[in-house]
Design a protein with these regions (language model features):
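Conserved mixed alpha/beta catalytic, RNA-binding, or beta-rich assembly cores of soluble enzyme
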Residues: 27-33, 112-113, 119-201
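An acidic, phosphate/nucleotide-engaging active-site surface
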Residues: 63-146
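Short internal beta-strands
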Residues: 48-56
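Short, charged/polar "capping" segments at the starts of alpha-helices
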Residues: 57-63, 166-167
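Histidine-anchored nucleotide/phosphate-binding helix
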Residues: 27-46
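Positively charged, low-complexity intrinsically disordered leader regions
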Residues: 1-11
Length: 201
């Protein structure tokens, strides 16, 4: 799908960053994978990847950019004018502010969006970790951006491993058979919704 959607100088959003308990720091599997994907998009297509993540992840992403051979900027206009470049954008954790930021990012008309291990809320609006605890306050609400871009018809790919990530609602019935804490009443936070990402994917 990316081969058909992405052309030279096209913007591609990569959504990542999952902040974990108890230390309240981001996990790195999604971040590292996203950096390698960003490099692949630049090398294969001449694309302009922008990592969208919680503010907690920005420093790690900026430090990793040189490791994958890319220059990194927080201004997407600069990214689109310079070679071998990528961007990073911190996305809000405040749900009330998320629609406005999502709308602003959407105006840049990305050719595609890829979510890699980014947290998504369940049907009740609660974000969970792997064992069903409420981590809503820790997470960037980039699921709002995902839903906005999907509604706009932007080609999209989601990667996750436990069901609480963006995009996993698409295969919710399958995930509920094999992954604990995902179905209604199974999470440990008391919301009763399970940790499966709501099916708006």
């Amino acid at each position: 799908m990316l081969c058909d959607a992405v052309k030279e100088n096209d913007l591609v959003y990569i959504i990542t960053g999952f902040v974990l308990l108890p230390h309240k720091v981001p996990e790195m599997d999604g971040t590292v994978s996203s950096m390698l994907l960003a490099r692949a998009l630049v090398m294969a297509f001449g694309a302009k990847p922008v990592i969208v993540c919680p503010a907690d992840s920005v420093q790690a992403i900026e430090k990793c950019a040189a490791v994958v051979g890319l220059h990194i900027y927080e201004d997407p206009d600069i990214v689109q004018t310079l070679p071998l470049s990528m961007g990073v954008a911190a996305f809000t954790k405040n749900l009330a502010d998320a629609p406005a930021q999502a709308a602003e990012l959407a105006t840049r008309k990305p050719a595609a969006v890829v979510s890699v291990e980014a947290c998504g809320a369940n049907a009740l609006g609660v974000c969970h970790n792997a064992i069903g605890l409420d981590v809503t306050a820790l997470q960037a609400r980039s699921d709002v951006l995902w839903e906005k871009l999907r509604a706009d018809g932007v080609p999209n790919i989601a990667i996750g491993d436990l069901g609480n990530e963006i995009g996993m609602g698409t295969i919710a019935d399958h995930i509920k058979k094999y992954v604990p804490f995902t179905d209604r009443g199974e999470c440990q936070c008391g919301c009763g919704g399970g940790h499966i990402k709501r099916h708006q994917d």
